[in-house]
């Protein structure tokens, strides 16, 4: 009696019935391919490979120009391959620069689940010609296919990539709707997983380990999302990729690299190496735990970017909710239009966040702190060769330097900055420093320096900040440019000189400064070698029995000193100054 369509779908074809032998000695390539071809020809959908070790010729039936293409087990469309948990597909040792254990090319509706697929990298003969890297030996090669699922498979020891997902066929035919779930992929010489020409790929719940170890070949990434273009022509482009809830460890270089993909989401992963948005566009890196392996020296950055792609106008990267610890630099931001928010960065050496050759950068609501006393070093935020950077609502603690900027159009607003040696240092470019709570609070690792300093050729607006528990200048300016110091609250100064400004032109307006120092000498505002500055409407209080020097400008020229309220203090001005309307109590 003829089988009905539902019965046909339920039929499971046993590969051993076609001569496949799981003894680890017999070449079963032809037998498994014959089984797959017969299954498809009969309208069945499922092939079963039982427990055993099946030897496969990964170069069989290959394209001489690309020996991985069409090679090994060639999987037709509308087929599901089920393997026992103890099944092993083992590639025979060879000397080819390319091969494949499973090839899925130009077909649709394929599923491979269970078992192990093992390469021959340790038995391989690495001939010097024609391609000496031998980086094209693949566990599963997917080219121009669609609706493919790889699940619960262990893949290891390939000369190239464990899995590669790319375009194929005539013209440009990307692979579409590919899922790799709950797999273990390890010890590939090149990348454990490469994603090149595709649209809609999901990698979820996998363990990705030890890519590029030993005699590995570049780039040695856990997961590499990388297309290819020349000039204005794009030959391969990865788009709509999700890398979610995976564990990545021991990969020689990046754990995950989006070199130039578009619309990539990297979320919920646990990694001991770098996650990179590269030159990619519209990358989201969210809610990952990235903790450096202390035994690894090759990867020094938790999350990084490389810049804007040659054919793109912006990066449009979002970095949010990640926990990053133990790296030299926590986050290295490059490119244009990057938003970093809600990240926790711990135990870095050089910089918590670095913005380098970056523009339109928003860094908000992050917690940057060194917890271990011997690692309380480095800079929480470093801005170099960058512009249009906003740093707001962040918390910084236990660092040598809180913020160092040489950028232009920098906004440093509403941050809480505590326990540091040097606070905010603007040494080039221009910045607005507004609404911050700044308290060195007895930082122990190195001596305390300035809370806010503006030096060299920089200019700054320092407005509505609160300074407390400091032992060195809360504000120090030695720039030749213009600064505005407006509406700040400087509490209980213990210093001989509280505000020290030399050279340049300064507007010191509406600040409140209280002196906590019990004895003389004391100067609250000292303006030195400046000209055409203004000291207006400030409130200056001393708690000493004797009057202190509230304002000293006798080594500057043409200063306006107007409308200040001075409690237990006096003004020492220069003969060229205008002194008017001040109240001395």
Pin down the residues of each PLM region.
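Acidic Gly/Asp/Thr-rich repetitive segments characteristic of extracellular carbohydrate-active
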Residues: 15-50
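Extracellular beta-strand-rich solenoid/capping regions of secreted or surface-exposed proteins
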Residues: 33-42, 55-80, 90-113, 122-147, ...
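Extracellular beta-strand solenoid repeats
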Residues: 48, 55, 74, 82, ...
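Short glycine/acidic-rich loop motifs that flank beta-strands on beta-rich extracellular proteins
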Residues: 58-59, 91-100, 121-127, 138, ...
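Right-handed parallel beta-helix
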Residues: 95, 99, 107-227
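Leucine-rich solenoid repeat scaffolds
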Residues: 549-585
